[in-house]
Amino acid sequence: MNLHEYQAKQLFARYGLPAPVGYACTTPREAEEAASKIGAGPWVVKCQVHAGGRGKAGGVKVVNSKEDIRAFAENWLGKRLVTYQTDANGQPVNQILVEAATDIAKELYLGAVVDRSSRRVVFMASTEGGVEIEKVAEETPHLIHKVALDPLTGPMPYQGRELAFKLGLEGKLVQQFTKIFMGLATIFLERDLALIEINPLVITKQGDLICLDGKLGADGNALFRQPDLREMRDQSQEDPREAQAAQWELNYVALDGNIGCMVNGAGLAMGTMDIVKLHGGEPANFLDVGGGATKERVTEAFKIILSDDKVKAVLVNIFGGIVRCDLIADGIIGAVAEVGVNVPVVVRLEGNNAELGAKKLADSGLNIIAAKGLTDAAQQVVAAVEGK
């Protein structure tokens, strides 16, 4: 679950990290009033969406008058911002962040993620702030400096100083950087985050560090113990199908293809998408119904898949280990009957009660294509989309 920039900066403030004074506004009038609260300009106005690349898309602007603030707010509030990180429809702009402009001398980068290979929280810092860190990693990886947090000791001040020295910081900037490093690490661990990023972390012309931007991603599996973060969730920034799936504890990610996939198990789901592409198809989604699939959840999964107008066929690939294939069959039959499916449905069942599940599908009288294996299933669903 991602947070908006203004929400990230609210958290920064709670932990004593320096950030520009700013206010999130939902109307042009509020935006003008925010400028008055901040004081004399110039100001920076920013569209609040869950996507990077806002500046290049016109969603960030330095303004010198309240009239310009009103014009910016009137232009963007209620509209959709399209960036390189969004789809063609973009993300809705419901808030504008108005904050004091900062005199920038140098831009840095500081962020942290959970590194799966080392099984540690890893901090990354770079002198190349203000650009996508992925681009820096690809083109100039030697400019990214890393430290891993020991899960027993947690963050240590010497690690912050080590990064500061590698960035070429001196004097009071080393102390300020170390404080920010320790604060970010504390936020990351206490708030069950998956990602935290300040890009850019700037050195002002007055010689101080300030968090000019903020990006936070919370671990969705830990939200049950982070009620205040859960309340910050902005579902308008999410695919409505993904939000609906989350309510049923389904793992759903929308993609750009036309073959809907319903699978139990994340690994099998990825393998299913791979074999569909291998045979010339394009998956419309990733959907994992999980090991505890019920008839109701399978029915809901079917509804979510078919709510995508791009879907021209559905592939159901179930391995019955924990889940029983006959229950999955009941869910498929119920969903097809309830929703009124008008696209081909290819089903591959293996494992626990697979034969009983296949018999139920055959006896249902519905237009469901039974596959004899995974390769056969992929070939049949691709052929169905192509009208063969």
Curated annotation (Swiss-Prot):
Exhibits two interesting properties: 'substrate synergism', in which the enzyme is most active for the catalysis of its partial reactions only when all the substrate-binding sites are occupied, and 'catalytic cooperativity' between alternating active sites in the tetramer, whereby the interaction of substrates (particularly ATP) at one site is needed to promote catalysis at the other. Its EC number is 6.2.1.5. Succinyl-CoA synthetase (SCS) of E.coli catalyzes its reaction via three steps that involve phosphoryl enzyme and enzyme-bound succinyl phosphate as intermediates. Keywords: ATP-binding, Ligase, Magnesium, Metal-binding, Nucleotide-binding, Tricarboxylic acid cycle. Changing residue 197 to A: Prevents phosphorylation of the enzyme intermediate in both reaction directions. Gene3D superfamilies: ATP-grasp fold, A domain (3.30.1490.20), ATP-grasp fold, B domain (3.30.470.20), Succinyl-CoA synthetase domains (3.40.50.261). ATP binds at residues 46, 53-55, 99, 102, 107. It catalyses: succinate + ATP + CoA = succinyl-CoA + ADP + phosphate; GTP + succinate + CoA = succinyl-CoA + GDP + phosphate. Optimum pH is 7.4. One of its GO terms (molecular function) is succinate-CoA ligase (ADP-forming) activity. It comes from the Bacteria. Belongs to the succinate/malate CoA ligase beta subunit family. Heterotetramer of two alpha and two beta subunits. GO terms for cellular component: cytoplasm; cytosol; succinate-CoA ligase complex; succinate-CoA ligase complex (ADP-forming). The lineage of its organism: Bacteria, Pseudomonadati, Pseudomonadota, Gammaproteobacteria, Enterobacterales. It comes from Escherichia coli (strain K12). The keyword Protein biosynthesis does not apply. Pathway: Carbohydrate metabolism; tricarboxylic acid cycle; succinate from succinyl-CoA (ligase route): step 1/1. The keyword ATP-binding applies. Binds 1 Mg(2+) ion per subunit. Succinyl-CoA synthetase functions in the citric acid cycle (TCA), coupling the hydrolysis of succinyl-CoA to the synthesis of either ATP or GTP and thus represents the only step of substrate-level phosphorylation in the TCA. The beta subunit provides nucleotide specificity of the enzyme and binds the substrate succinate, while the binding sites for coenzyme A and phosphate are found in the alpha subunit. Can use either ATP or GTP, but prefers ATP. HAMAP family: Succ_CoA_beta. Substrate binds at residues 264, 321-323. Mg(2+) binds at residues 199, 213. Pfam families: ATP-grasp_2 (PF08442), Ligase_CoA (PF00549). One of its GO terms (biological process) is tricarboxylic acid cycle. This is Succinate--CoA ligase [ADP-forming] subunit beta.
